[in-house]
Amino acid sequence: MLLQKIESPKDLKKLSIEELKKLSSEIREIIINTVENNGGHLASNLGTVELTLALHYVFDAPKDKIIWDVGHQAYTHKLITGRAKDFHTLRQYGGISGYIAPWESEYDHFAVGHAGTSLSAALGFAKARDLKGEKYKVVAVIGDGALTSGMALEALNQIGYLNTDLIVILNDNEHSISPNVGAMALYLAKLRKHPLYRFFKQTTQNLLKNSSIGKGLLAFDLKLERSLKSLLLENPMFEYLGFKYFGPFDGHDIPLLISVFKGIKDNLSCPVLIHVTTKKGIGHKDAEATPSKFHSIGSKSEKEKKVPTYTEVFGKALVELGGMYPEVVAITAAMPEGTGLSYFAQRFPERFFDVGIAEQHAVTFAAGLAKNGLKPVVAIYSTFLQRSFDQIIHDVCLQKLPITFVLDRAGIVSDDGPTHQGIFDLSYLRLIPNMVIAAPKDESELRDLLYTAINYPGPFAIRYPKGKGVGVELKNRFEKIEIGKSEIVKQGRDVLILAIGSMVYPAVEAGNILRSEGIYPTVVNVRFLKPLDILTLEELILSHNTIITVEENVITGGLFGAIAELINILKINKKVIPIGLPDKFIEQGNVQLLRDIYGLNEYKIAEKIISVLEDIKV
């Protein structure tokens, strides 16, 4: 195999065009086999193989800085930068990351996992280079989906204004996780589809691939191309922002990409945007046909589960509630399938809004809808809601608007690693006035909390984990839950276990283990982090000598913080022992493994409580 000879991009430069094409086929096969076994981002990586090879063929990494947006499409980059022998460990505990990780390789310059960061980071690299008097190229690779994010557009504005030597590669595959939406997507489609421009592109691309053409003709072709675009397009947006725009080019045509990249690298030292079009999922029949379903796939073990996921239960429950309440509207930030809102979109398309990768806009858009009498439900991953923190405070909670925030992927989220763990939401939402925060113990309680939230006249956040529910039977009706009311699941006397959300069932099982050891705990489903059930909790705290909190969230500021503060306010002289996640970023790994490592399964919870009780006796 050719890949066995590639230890670094320097080895890549020794290959012929035909060998590069053969290498691209080898890489696709490795990516497909690895992702089907380990899980990961399939469609996006299959779409960037040739683009990545051409980039590393022309630019001199790691001296030249290639800054990836999101980083989920960089598997080829990893394979040709010395990590091929470890690629089988992709997204596994202790293995290589599914994203860009500077601690992993000198070729990974900027840690990433969220969309829209590459242009700002690349501009920082470029300006630092200039101020230090250094000479190298900075290339940012961003997808058309990520380009819809506000941060990316802010960076485009600044890059053009500063007139910095920086190359932006726009990887246009017409998808982010789901098909792209908005005016930017329409604008890029206009660039791709103009018939006269497409004729011109076909002609010049054939010329560009001729290796005998010199730099002079290449430079002439680029100037001619730009002149023709100005005649064809009513509003060449990127040019107005201060970029020299070239494209669209076929992102799977290796000789063409090499010619374009070389020409621009050697001839230009200003802001340049190179527009390449790629096919998401190319090389895998099913992924090409339905790329959104193959954006990120689970491992083989994950595919065997039959119990419905929390995402499915939420999505179908919202459809039921949408039928009951015509004022309910649903909003997602480019993730209708991932959040379960695709069910609602199919049933109520006029009441469904996909705003693209624009979490800040999603929240304030919801605020406007709520202010005018509607009931918005904003479904978003826990890790991505962080991006709209100011909007939640300033535009929603300050006005106490009736918006339901549904936080999917809360807690440990397995193999995507530190950028995607949903372990901070209990902490960062708890400090905001007027916010109700709840976490269901199971999928049935999720349905009732959703019903309760939609009927609540203020901001209401519901968080739940990734993956299947616990398998309880779902009722065919909704029941309103009293705001702030906890639930005593098991009554005991020796120790008080206060658990929330995904930790309630493990706490109950831990209680069963303790009972077998002659220890009788009281187990409480706290359910509402805010407001707390103060009356019930005060009574329970006073009647137990040992208090344990259990949460799948960082200990700082979450359930432990809330209970410790309550005890202090009530002037109760008792100690609280926290079980939760430490003050660190949690690595990638299987959920069950990580819960074991961090003491969040029933066995480790029971073990910890036994240890605490033994220490108290001593």
UniProtKB/Swiss-Prot annotation:
Its cofactor is Mg(2+); thiamine diphosphate. SUPFAM superfamilies: Thiamin diphosphate-binding fold (THDP-binding), TK C-terminal domain-like. InterPro entries: Dxylulose-5-P_synthase, THDP-binding, Transketo_C/PFOR_II, Transketolase-like_Pyr-bd, Transketolase_C, Transketolase_CS. Keywords: Isoprene biosynthesis, Magnesium, Metal-binding, Thiamine biosynthesis, Thiamine pyrophosphate, Transferase. Binds 1 Mg(2+) ion per subunit. GO terms for cellular component: cytosol. It comes from the Bacteria. Coiled coil: none annotated. It holds the Pfam family DXP_synthase_N. GO terms for molecular function: 1-deoxy-D-xylulose-5-phosphate synthase activity; magnesium ion binding; thiamine pyrophosphate binding. It is an enzyme of class 2 (transferase). GO terms for biological process: 1-deoxy-D-xylulose 5-phosphate biosynthetic process; isopentenyl diphosphate biosynthetic process, methylerythritol 4-phosphate pathway; terpenoid biosynthetic process; thiamine biosynthetic process. Its EC number is 2.2.1.7. It catalyses: D-glyceraldehyde 3-phosphate + pyruvate + H(+) = 1-deoxy-D-xylulose 5-phosphate + CO2. Mg(2+) binds at D144, N173. Pathway: Metabolic intermediate biosynthesis; 1-deoxy-D-xylulose 5-phosphate biosynthesis; 1-deoxy-D-xylulose 5-phosphate from D-glyceraldehyde 3-phosphate and pyruvate: step 1/1. Catalyzes the acyloin condensation reaction between C atoms 2 and 3 of pyruvate and glyceraldehyde 3-phosphate to yield 1-deoxy-D-xylulose-5-phosphate (DXP). NCBIfam families: dxs, PRK05444.2-2. HAMAP family: DXP_synth. Belongs to the transketolase family. DXPS subfamily. Homodimer. This is 1-deoxy-D-xylulose-5-phosphate synthase. The lineage of its organism: Bacteria, Pseudomonadati, Dictyoglomota, Dictyoglomia, Dictyoglomales. The gene is dxs.
